[in-house]
């Protein structure tokens, strides 16, 4: 390889990947992206995909608008993008940081994409209390760890974390 070639983070030797991810800092970044989604006129949800070395590989805001796509959840859209562009060897070492707990649909997408870990802010239960019966967010109070427990492989779940920060983004957004 030429001296100037920069290898992607996932090509580093395993012993260099032993660093500890700063889960709070990375979750704050996802929560900040949810603020940007809301400022852009969309629902206040976002997530980031992080490689084993802490590099943010992809960012995704909620994609409900402009087409009113009820399946346009940030996590589901990000998993479609990731699973069609990144190698499986990379995905199995990645973590998704998401402003709110993945719903059943998004947890399924995360599972089938093959991610290692989920870190989330607000629980589905708390989100349901915030959004009420808003027709654009019919929340399922079904924790993602239950979805993952039904699978054939383990997905590590960390959360809820930074709940107050994650909830603050939703103030006044749902009615």
Predicted regions: what they are:
Residues 2-8:
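Extreme N-terminal basic, low-complexity initiation segments
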Residues 10, 15-40, 109-175:
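Zinc-dependent deaminase
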Residues 44, 95-99, 119:
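Conserved beta-strand segments that form the floor/walls of ligand-binding pockets within enzyme
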Residues 45-50:
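Short beta-strand scaffold segments in enzyme catalytic cores
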Residues 57-64:
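Short beta->alpha transition motifs characteristic of CBS
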Residues 66-76, 81:
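A short, polar/charged loop-to-alpha-helix boundary motif
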Residues 80-113:
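Helix-adjacent hinge/juxtasegments
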């Amino acid at each position: 390889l030429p001296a100037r070639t920069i290898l992607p983070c996932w090509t580093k030797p395993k012993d260099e990947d032993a660093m500890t991810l700063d889960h709070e800092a990375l979750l704050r970044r996802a929560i900040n992206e949810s603020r940007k989604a809301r400022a852009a006129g969309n629902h206040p949800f976002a997530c980031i995909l992080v490689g084993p070395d802490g590099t943010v590989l992809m960012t995704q805001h909620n994609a409900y608008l402009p087409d009113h796509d009820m399946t346009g959840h940030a996590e589901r859209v990000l998993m479609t993008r990731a699973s069609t562009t990144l190698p499986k060897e990379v995905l199995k070492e990645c973590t998704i940081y998401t402003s709110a707990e993945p719903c059943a649909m998004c947890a399924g997408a995360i599972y089938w994409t093959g991610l290692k870990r989920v870190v989330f802010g607000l629980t589905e239960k708390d989100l349901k209390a915030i959004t009420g019966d808003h027709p654009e967010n019919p929340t399922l109070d079904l924790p993602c760890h239950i979805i993952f427990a039904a699978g054939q492989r383990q997905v590590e779940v960390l959360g809820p974390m930074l709940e107050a920060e994650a909830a603050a983004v939703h103030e006044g957004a749902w009615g």
